[in-house]
């Protein structure tokens, strides 16, 4: 297989069970590169802003686990 794969995993949390409460990043890990979105993946950053950046830069969300107050999302980008 030629080319490379970038993988971003985000652990997020929200402070309330109210569905529209903003989610914040607890931890993010990157395999490969998250450019140009690396600066949106710090703890405390907005999960929504990170997702919009990733999706706008050819990442595809392949997993979204939502337990209400916390969750995990995985994004991949193929070259």
Region annotations inferred by a language model:
Residues 1-79:
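Terminus-proximal functional modules
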